[in-house]
Amino acid sequence: TYTKAEPGTHPTNRYNHRHEWRIGVSGDPKRPKIPVAGNNNTSAIQWGELRQVMAGTTSLVGSGSAKGLLRNLDTNVQEGLTEKPIDYDTFPLNDTGGERLTSGCGYPSIHKASALTAIDAYGPHISEGINDEARNEFLCTSSTLYGGQRLVEDKTAIIHAIGLTAQDAWLASARGASVIWSPRSNISLYGHTAQTPLLAKVGVSIALGTDWTASGSMNILRELQCAADLNEKQYGNFFTDRDLWQMATFNAALATATNDVLGQLQVGLVGDVSIFIGTADRKEHKAVVRAGVEDVALVLRGGIPMYGDAAVLEALGADDAGKCETLDVCSVPKRLCTERETGKKLADLETAAGKPIYQLFACGVPPKEPTCVPFRDNEFTGMSAADDPDGDGIKGAADNCPTVFNPIRPMDRGAQPDTDGDGFGDACDPCPLDSNHAMCRKPDLNDEDGDGINNAIDNCSTIANANQKDTDMDGQGDVCDACPTFANPAGAACEFSVKDLRDPARGLRPPLGTKVTIKNLLIVGLRSVKSFGFHARDVGTDLPYSGILVFQGGTKAPAATDGTPLQVGHIVTVTGNFTVFSEQDEVDTVTSVVITGMDAAAAALVTDVKTRDLTGGMQSAAERLENLLCRVKTVTARATLSATDDDFWVSDEAAEMCTGTTPGCTRVSDFLLDGDKNDGSPKYAAGTALTEIQGIVSGFANQYALSPMTLTDIKP
């Protein structure tokens, strides 16, 4: 879909995670959102496909499709093939809103592993970035820990896979997963790319793909050029030309589960063949790896000529009643069968695609081509020097891989990864998980994490823990136990108080997605109109960080598991998943609510605060007061949120006019009153004096508000 746009300009600071350039979540003006227009019509999609045909491509996987030209292997538009479409998944975590986690799997929703049984190939975008958030995506798609799903399997081709460790690569290899590598797009956006020498060493099959034109290559030949340049300058020629060629052919067919019909010159396959012209310095596989579009002599899709030297197509009689036209390509006459495939001549197709549009081909380096030279401002230049041959910014003896590019990523804790501690960096270590190179092991499905312990007896089979430490003796190793000091055998819920979950000073916060049980939880507010559930806190008077939202969802008023309607003052025991939604800590996926007592007087305990206290921010007063019953006194209504929103601003400071989200103001929300109906009630004119307002403190999207539960909570 995104092949019409010409490449954009990327900041020299580079990005750390895809959501930074997608929607600007970093908030850093030096890492802005990149605006990119998609292909908005069939002709634009066909124009992008034609660009790839001229490079020798016959099949692709990606967003959007159109009839003619290429086989779209993720759809049924396969130009004669009847393969099961690959499940192409741009957001396997359903994180389109930019959700990022450094631990736990409390994403909006993760693709179900059970869905893989109905398909032959799965292509999810995973770990597109270089920080902890990117690495966590792999953890949550390779294991069921903390609410994750086991999506990394032998039918999975991980797209990007930049933020992986050596142990992640080992696990992917043990499972038989492959990786789809897009070096130009990765380098231009992040300055880093997937650690392909490491992946290859542990046995991961690597396929090559261009990604989109906004940050990637114009066509597969330019992507091969990029891979070859990295191989020569950054990887010490780790890959052969044959290896690189195979990434664009057989390995790509393996990744899409089409190797039974595509990817090889073999009797019985469908005959997708591209022939290239070699030269004295471009022989054999290098004739493809270092080719330009002018060097493509013939492209056959199922034996049907699509593009090539004019003389060759004419000799084959591939004119199709004038539906193939001649085109000068870098001073070489070519023929291109555009009208036969799209119903339009080339000029008409370009017009129909609309402007602006990226050119069809280039002779040599395309204009505005995104860089393939690794670079991050003030970190590394990607340029070889006597004291830094691989250009990774680490000089001389300090570099644990002097000739293989392995700069330090934000996820690497300030050091080049060396998992086995033998002095050889993972990127260049022939045995990255074994310090004894004479006993170099290969990834084994029976030891997925590579710690030397068979899965069947490993107390943490997806995270390496050779010492098998299990403090609480519950059968789960400490490294994968959300509560290592509280026994929860067989994945039972961990018991926490709300303060355990939320107070940073306690240091007990578990990964998001952890199944938890909270006892002695006092209900202080009900969500009875919309987004049903309740606000509750730990029993007692130690209030900061003691409040939490229990989200029950559905369409019914809050109730216990036995159906008893819940009331303010009920003391309950709750079991569900600890997570974050729109910056608010909460318990969702609730499996049990049991009433254990009643204390209406304690539930009525209100905390008096100043309007300035309810200004947001990490570890602010407002965050400490989330989901507690609070009150502001002697305030003045200053302004409504907007003409169509009943929320209004109040302040207890005479000089504060609340012209925006200023520090001295509190937002009063009608969410608990009427579910944000915006029906004109409650409404207070600017200047109205109010004796007090009490309600529940909410922190939705880090925009704190006081939510009265009844109109009597607002006193004139």
For the regions a language model picked out, list residue spans one by one.
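Loop/turn positions that initiate beta-strands
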Residues: 119, 268-271, 569, 688
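Beta-propeller domains
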Residues: 118-137, 154-160, 164-171, 183, ...
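Extracellular calcium-associated, cysteine-rich motifs in secreted modular proteins
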Residues: 379-495
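Extended non-catalytic accessory segments flanking core domains
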Residues: 316-317, 321-381, 484, 488-716
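His/Asp/Glu-enriched, well-ordered alpha-helical/loop segment
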Residues: 143-156, 192-278, 290-305
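Metal-coordinating catalytic core of metallo-dependent amide/deamination hydrolases
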Residues: 41-47, 57-154
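Structural preference for beta-strand elements that scaffold enzyme active sites
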Residues: 59, 121-123, 155-157, 178-180, ...
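Active-site microenvironment of metallo-dependent hydrolases
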Residues: 1-91, 112-113, 246-387
